[in-house]
Curated annotation (Swiss-Prot):
Family named by the database record: Belongs to the universal ribosomal protein uL13 family.
A GO cellular component annotation in the UniProt record: cytosolic large ribosomal subunit
Origin species: Picosynechococcus sp. (strain ATCC 27264 / PCC 7002 / PR-6)
Identification of the protein by name: Large ribosomal subunit protein uL13
Source taxon at top rank: Bacteria
Gene Ontology terms: biological process: negative regulation of translation; translation
InterPro entries referenced in this protein's UniProt entry, alphabetically: Ribosomal_uL13, Ribosomal_uL13_bac-type, Ribosomal_uL13_CS, Ribosomal_uL13_sf
GO function terms (MF aspect): mRNA binding; structural constituent of ribosome
PANTHER family: LARGE RIBOSOMAL SUBUNIT PROTEIN UL13M, RIBOSOMAL PROTEIN L13
Keywords: Ribonucleoprotein, Ribosomal protein
Assembly and binders: Part of the 50S ribosomal subunit.
Role summary: This protein is one of the early assembly proteins of the 50S ribosomal subunit, although it is not seen to bind rRNA by itself. It is important during the early stages of 50S assembly.
């Protein structure tokens, strides 16, 4: 019987990619980033293994949502205490912690288990254009989420 060859963790080549989120649609960007984190863009993808790459997202404060979502999309968190629910809109969270918006969108698209938590640690999000990962020599990954756009 011939078995399917599974890649060994030490033979997998994990690259670093940098993605510019400026003027990109939030959900479409998060979907593409989640695919790269999961490793679905590789031939050796295996569902139960970490075959993905590291992703650095810069310009998180410039990500956009369409329609009335800037005022209507709500982000909720709870302190665990009675009456401890905090609610803020997309605009409020973007002013306060712009990195959190992309992190929450991508985290929701990863598996809800130990593998998903490990994959999430490979996502690095920064508000400006600078990031401290130059030593890893990240490649530029172009993701175009603008319909009909030329980016």
């Amino acid at each position: 019987m011939i078995k399917t060859p599974l890649p060994k963790q030490e033979t997998l080549d994990q690259k670093w990619y940098v993605v510019d989120a400026a003027d990109q649609r939030l959900g479409r960007l998060a979907s593409e980033v989640a695919k790269v984190l999961r490793g679905k863009n590789k031939a050796e993808y295996t569902p139960h293994m970490d075959t993905g790459d590291f992703v650095i997202v810069v310009n998180a404060e410039k990500v956009v949502v369409t329609g009335r979502k800037p005022e209507q999309k709500l982000y909720r968190r709870h302190s665990g205490r009675p009456g401890g629910m905090k609610v803020e809109t997309f605009n409020q969270l973007q002013d306060r912690i712009p990195e959190r918006i992309i992190e929450k969108a991508v985290k929701g698209m990863l598996p809800k288990n130990a593998l998903g938590r490990r994959l999430f640690t490979k996502l690095k999000v920064y508000a400006g254009t600078e990031h401290p990962h130059a030593a890893q020599q990240p490649e530029v990954l172009t993701i175009n989420t603008i319909p009909g756009g030329d980016n």
